[in-house]
């Protein structure tokens, strides 16, 4: 099956000679130098632990997941790290769905050896309960387009996905202290993986019996080259892994030359990955700030409830303070308006006669005479002037009152009481007419 699929696409003799002749002149088909790297682009998805890497025409997507499992008996305090690759039929005519072929298995082994044997990921931090529960991290790599040098692109996709992955926080509790509680993302912030260094893979292609070496071979160059070697190094120059498939031998000097090239390139590639990851984390933190007010309802412990209650109290106090500030501002505005209106009235006042009348229009002259007589004041001829209906037309009302007239009227009233009407004095019997009770 592998032989049949491998023979589906071949370069012609003229194409092969053209590529080899160009390499002898230190030229490549895509215009690069022998040790130049193609353009690297890294993107991230909305979920934690998803990455998309494009190296020239090569397109690889990585996704990281984790689950709680029982640890291995020989390593009860360490988690596990596994890598799985999947070749899409759209990426290359030689790929077909189903069971992974030799190329897929080899790709997974190279990346796994560079990550796990170099101890790049701290597996001891993945332990939750020694001997019973640890985190198992799984990396899935999907080949979307094969433009050559799948190992380097897949390795960068795996590293980018691991650096942006977050696992749920968990605690050990319960009655016996052996119960593992996984906290949701809304309740507690997820935790990143502890990565000590970034092992970067670099692939070299050999031509003309190992006399010509190129870095980052393309799909066409891979069909012509007689051998290849993958070197995994970090930014410090430490060699993490070396993989050389094929039967073609290579001199020791060529291998050392490849190691020097990989070490010089590792720092630049590591810088690109870290910058992209930092930019993604900053964007993610901004989105997280907007998402925090809408927390999902969940049953939480006492300290968490207390924190929520304090948060509610502080929010209520802030609202009350805002309302009081609004009321104070409204009162200030109203007082300012009143002051301005009074100032305008005072400014517009020009002075003039008052229209105020101390007496009402329907004044009775007889009642006025009686009231003056009751006071006992000597009454003489007087005149009072009043203004009717607020107009300037004044009417003089002369009132002549004498003591005799007032006493005459009072005498008339007394005679009326004596003649016909009964008074309170008449109702009381004198002492002479009262009957003795004895």
From Swiss-Prot:
Q: Keyword ATP-binding: yes or no?
A: no
Q: Locate the compositionally biased regions of type Polar residues.
A: 380-394
Q: One cellular component GO annotation, for this chain's record? A: nucleus
Q: Provide the protein's localization.
A: Cytoplasm; Nucleus
SUPFAM superfamilies in alphabetical order: Ribonuclease PH domain 2-like, Ribosomal protein S5 domain 2-like
Database matches in InterPro entries:
ExoRNase_PH_dom1 (IPR001247), ExoRNase_PH_dom2 (IPR015847), ExoRNase_PH_dom2_sf (IPR036345), Exosome_comp_Rrp42_subfam (IPR050590), PNPase/RNase_PH_dom_sf (IPR027408), Ribosomal_Su5_D2-typ_SF (IPR020568), Rrp45 (IPR033100)
Asked whether the keyword rRNA-binding is assigned, the reply is no
Ranges of biased composition (kind: Basic and acidic residues): 307-322, 334-347, 410-429
> According to its UniProt record, where is this protein mainly located?
cytoplasm
Q: Where is this region: Disordered?
A: 293-322, 334-438
Q: Which GO terms describe its molecular function?
A: 3'-5'-RNA exonuclease activity; RNA binding
The record ties this protein, via CDD domains, to: RNase_PH_RRP45
- Superkingdom of the organism of origin: Eukaryota
**Disruption phenotype annotation:** Bright green glossy stems and siliques due to reduced cuticular wax accumulation.
Q: What Pfam families does this protein's entry cite?
A: RNase_PH, RNase_PH_C
- State the protein's purpose: Probable 3'->5' exoribonuclease involved in the regulation of cuticular wax biosynthesis by controlling the expression of CER3. May act by degrading a specific mRNA species encoding a negative regulator of CER3 transcription. Can perform exosomal functions and complement the yeast rrp45 null mutant.
Would you identify the family this protein belongs to, as annotated? Belongs to the RNase PH family.
Name this polypeptide is given: Exosome complex component RRP45B
Q: Which organism is it from?
A: Arabidopsis thaliana
């Amino acid at each position: 099956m592998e032989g049949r699929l491998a023979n589906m696409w071949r370069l012609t003799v003229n194409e092969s000679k053209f590529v080899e002749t160009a390499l002898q002149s230190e030229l490549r088909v895509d215009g690069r130098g022998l040790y130049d790297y193609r353009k690297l682009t890294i993107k991230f998805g909305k979920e934690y632990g998803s990455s998309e890497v494009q190296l020239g025409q090569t397109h690889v997507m990585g996704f990281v997941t984790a689950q709680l499992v029982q640890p291995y008996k020989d390593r009860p305090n360490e988690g596990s790290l596994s890598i799985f690759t999947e070749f899409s039929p759209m990426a290359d005519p030689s790929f077909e769905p189903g069971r992974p072929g030799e190329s897929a298995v080899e790709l997974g082994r190279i990346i796994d050896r560079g990550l796990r044997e170099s101890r790049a990921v701290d597996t001891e931090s993945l332990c939750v309960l020694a001997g019973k529960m640890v985190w198992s991290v799984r990396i899935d790599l999907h080949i979307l387009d094969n433009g050559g040098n799948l190992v380097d692109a897949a390795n960068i996709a795996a590293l980018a996905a691991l650096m942006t992955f977050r696992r749920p926080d968990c605690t050990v509790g319960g009655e016996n202290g052996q119960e593992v509680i996984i906290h949701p993302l809304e309740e507690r912030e997820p935790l990143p993986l502890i990565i000590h260094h970034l092992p970067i893979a670099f692939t070299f292609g050999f031509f003309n019996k190992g006399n010509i070496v190129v870095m980052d071979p393309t799909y066409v160059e891979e069909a012509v080259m007689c051998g290849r070697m993958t070197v995994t190094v970090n930014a410090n120059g430490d060699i993490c892994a070396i993989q050389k498939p094929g039967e073609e031998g290579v001199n020791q000097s060529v291998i050392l030359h490849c190691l020097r090239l990989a070490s010089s390139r590792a720092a630049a590639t590591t810088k690109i990955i870290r910058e992209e990851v930092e930019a993604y984390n900053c964007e993610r933190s901004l989105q997280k700030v907007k998402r925090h007010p809408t927390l999902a309802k969940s049953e939480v412990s006492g300290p968490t409830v207390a924190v929520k209650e304090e948060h509610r109290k502080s929010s209520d106090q802030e609202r009350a303070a805002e309302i009081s500030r609004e009321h104070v501002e409204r009162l200030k505005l109203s007082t300012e308006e009143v002051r301005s209106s009074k100032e305008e009235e005072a400014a517009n006042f020009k002075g003039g006669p008052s229209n105020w009348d101390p007496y009402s229009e329907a004044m009775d002259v007889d009642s006025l005479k009686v009231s003056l007589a009751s006071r006992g004041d000597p009454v003489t001829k007087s005149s009072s002037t009043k203004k009717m209906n607020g107009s300037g037309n004044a009417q003089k009302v002369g009132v002549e009152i004498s003591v005799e007239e007032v006493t005459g009227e009072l005498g008339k009233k007394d005679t009326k009481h004596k003649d016909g009407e009964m008074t309170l004095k008449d109702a009381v019997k004198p002492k002479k007419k009262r009957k003795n009770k004895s």
